[in-house]
Amino acid sequence: FLFNEFDNIYVSFSGGKDSGVLLNLCIQYIREHNLDRKIGVYHMDYEAQYQMTTEYVEQTFRENQDILEIYHVCVPFKVVTCASMFQTYWRPWDESMHAHWVRPMPKNCYKKEDFPFYNEEMWDYTFQTSFASWYHKKHDAVRTCCLVGIRTQESLDRWRTIHGNNRLNSYHNLMWTRRLGYDLYNAYPIYD
């Protein structure tokens, strides 16, 4: 359904279980149906993440680079933190803190300079929404869909995304879709 309705599709891939299953289902679908297209993959690299997550993301990219258009994003957007009594946010890949980075910045990643919409006051989820619009325009797409795998039990906002009764902003009244902008949608085809 989604590959017929949207000419431009990308997966928001954290490296976790839900987004990993979703991305692998898309990869499998593209390969089994011999689709002559690539699928975008958006990975927000938070710098301080589990080593096995980083290894899984890198392996997935490496093994499927023939059909993936990879956006490995290493940008110093603001991220909420509860690990400090002195800071309300932190910034992954903050150049002013380079000496304290948890690990080296990955090669071939996208940096703040690659995104004309980026500004220093931007939070991670604001960046994500702006990325969707930028990606849609970059591809001169008719209709763009970002595929997201979520755990609805993790927060009330996530649960409402799927089970809420706001259908005005859905695609063809499908409860697992949300309109982000003109011809720009998020879809949550798998959720638990």
Give the ranges of each region predicted by the language model.
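ATP-dependent adenylation/nucleotidyltransferase module used to activate substrates
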Residues: F1-Y191
